[in-house]
Amino acid sequence: MKRVTIVVPCYNEAERLDTERFASFSDDRYDVRFLFVNDGSTDETQRVLEGLRNRASERVEVLCLPKNRGKAEAVRQGIVRAFSSECDYVGFWDADLATPLSTIPEFCDFLDSRLDIEAVIGSRVKLLGRQVERSTSRHYAGRVFATTAAFVLDIQVYDTQCGAKLFRATPEWARIFSAPFSTRWIFDIEIIARLRELRRGTSQPEAKDVIYEYPLMVWRDVEGSKVRLKDFVRSIADMARIWKRYGRGKGPKKIGDW
């Protein structure tokens, strides 16, 4: 059985965090360990997380950042911490559980069966027979964003921003997360850009051939999301920054070059 660590970034989630669902899942899945990162919350998030850790101490760890750093840095620090422990797969999951925890074993099974794939990322595609509940405005905003992201990455990816991703715990992925990202929110794009740059000019398969977009069976918009219209506008500017930094890569990066 593979060992899995899932990083869960949390900022002021005291009222929304469904500790019962996390605890119940932990009771059933001894192979999955959760690493919650409290990103400088100003509410009772730390108390709630400590309560969950006390209930499932062997499978729950809490990392507390002294001040708010943004989702990108919270996830990155959690991933770096996860790589310091023994695990086969490492990933991150949104705390609101828009993607249910039952999807984690599906991602693991897929990586088990496809040794050519290095990462599985959730994709919110509304298809018949699937329960993907996304507002119309978010859907169309997402399509604009995804089209822009595909241009920046030169990879036809459908959904970069779903908060459910799982990676093989390899030195290559450790390098990708070794330095802070240049944006606070759309770091998902930068993850793919870094992988693409590491493999550019090498004999390894290209990034587009080792990342699998997994169409989710269930996903739902959760009330209280912290992504606002101004964040969407800012993300377009951030995309330009990513393109400038990675869009004209000339070869594999050295550690620390990010």
Where do the protein language model's features map onto the residues?
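Short, well-formed alpha-helical segments that are part of the catalytic scaffolds
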Residues: 12-27
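A conserved acidic beta->alpha catalytic loop
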Residues: 38-47, 97
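Short beta-strand/loop segment that forms part of the nucleotide-sugar
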Residues: 8, 22, 30-41, 63-65
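Acidic helix N-cap motif at the loop->helix transition within catalytic regions
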Residues: 15-19, 43-52
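Donor nucleotide-sugar binding loop of glycosyltransferases
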Residues: 13-16, 41, 71, 100
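Acceptor/aglycone-binding surface of glycosyltransferases and processive sugar-polymer synthases
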Residues: 65-84, 89, 101-185, 222-225
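Hydrophobic helical membrane-anchoring modules
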Residues: 1-4, 178-258
